[in-house]
């Protein structure tokens, strides 16, 4: 492609509203433009990268035995009502009515559509297992779209869905998809981790997220420093054991703590460590109140609370709800003298607290000399806290470290979550009706483009891996007015194309400095510069990733480029 005939609107200045590196560079290098908040146009360079990423995904999906189709973005409310998600999904679901007042949604996912399709078309075990996938636009009404393509309101996803007659069959496909995803992200050149995760609004049980390591990641990954263990911080179990001290039990005493609200303030005021304090948090778990107790230096994990009660919705109680249930303010909560209508559960670490401190359910007062079981009853002890750096790894190997990650893929074992709700059944070998078992597997395709840009960039611009770069070679004629340079560049533009390379040829009548700056900004892996030694048949090659440059004869050009791209 000749750059003079293309559409690559580069920018010299960083756009004011672009917060992160990938967003800044994709805008500046002419890959994307914002159409509305969280909505983007892929310009020609961006479209080429998108197509490269999609091609890798298709190859790996097809290799894993998945079959491509295309489902509608506009989905009838009836299907979402059958699954129950029409009522539970929340404000992120974009809803609309047609001219006949019928309800529709712009799909954030396609579980309902695919389940209805397979339910209506597959009637016998002989047609299973079946895995179908699509690459399609999705919609989510994000409260605050940010970071460019990383969190938009319209985005492109690859979503696959598998249907099975047995758990063993699902396990086999899940493992194939897990391996396919690993191959996809490896081929994109990414530094990533597959982590144990929570299924969220999709539902289901076993699930892994594929996280690209990045300082701007919205998720925290807990990983072992001595093994391959990695999990989303919400899901990492705590295996720490706690020794209970043998100090004599003191009597329970209520003390005045004026103006002391936080654990740090109370601990300092009473001259104890946070480990001696019991932190009390009131959650609304579906339709009941639960008081969750954790040690003062720990944080309560709402996902673990949700899983403990197998709940649909878990939220911190509002100040008004706290007043209603506990008759006190949030900063004074404690487990002593609580109404029987409130369930009390505690993290394992609380069991080891001796002569501790807790709120007295009265403004400006706390209890000291607090001992669980003696002073209040706990319904159940469980792992209810977030794992922390320095905790032992759940696999027993090494200790936990934290990293930030951008989620680019997610695989789920859905089980019968959707098939049962939507009556997706088949006839087994004995002619009996059975419910299909499902899995689903998603990749954020447009988000993946941004994640690659986030990992592969330097102070001068983007540095695309060869596998997803918009072009293999950026050919630059230093002086377009010089006949020898222009002729040699024209000749090798044709020859490189014939040799199978994708070439962007900068034939613009611009200064050399502008061309080189744009080349670095765009980030094509190999730059070939035709300059002063054109009359000798000598050109300069520069590797974008390493900055390495060399002069070579044009006779060696094709072999040299091929070798460099394979490194």
Swiss-Prot record:
It holds the Pfam family tRNA_edit. Catalyzes the attachment of proline to tRNA(Pro) in a two-step reaction: proline is first activated by ATP to form Pro-AMP and then transferred to the acceptor end of tRNA(Pro). As ProRS can inadvertently accommodate and process non-cognate amino acids such as alanine and cysteine, to avoid such errors it has two additional distinct editing activities against alanine. One activity is designated as 'pretransfer' editing and involves the tRNA(Pro)-independent hydrolysis of activated Ala-AMP. One of its GO terms (biological process) is prolyl-tRNA aminoacylation. One of its GO terms (molecular function) is aminoacyl-tRNA deacylase activity. Consists of three domains: the N-terminal catalytic domain, the editing domain and the C-terminal anticodon-binding domain. It comes from Geobacillus sp. (strain WCH70). SUPFAM superfamilies: Class II aaRS ABD-related, Class II aaRS and biotin synthetases, YbaK/ProRS associated domain. InterPro entries: aa-tRNA-synt_IIb, aa-tRNA-synth_II, aa-tRNA-synth_II/BPL/LPL, Anticodon-bd, Anticodon-bd_dom_sf, Pro-tRNA-ligase_IIa, Pro-tRNA-synth_IIa_bac-type, Pro-tRNA-Synthase_IIa_type1. This is Proline--tRNA ligase. The keyword Aminoacyl-tRNA synthetase applies. It is found in: Cytoplasm. GO terms for cellular component: cytosol. Its EC number is 6.1.1.15.
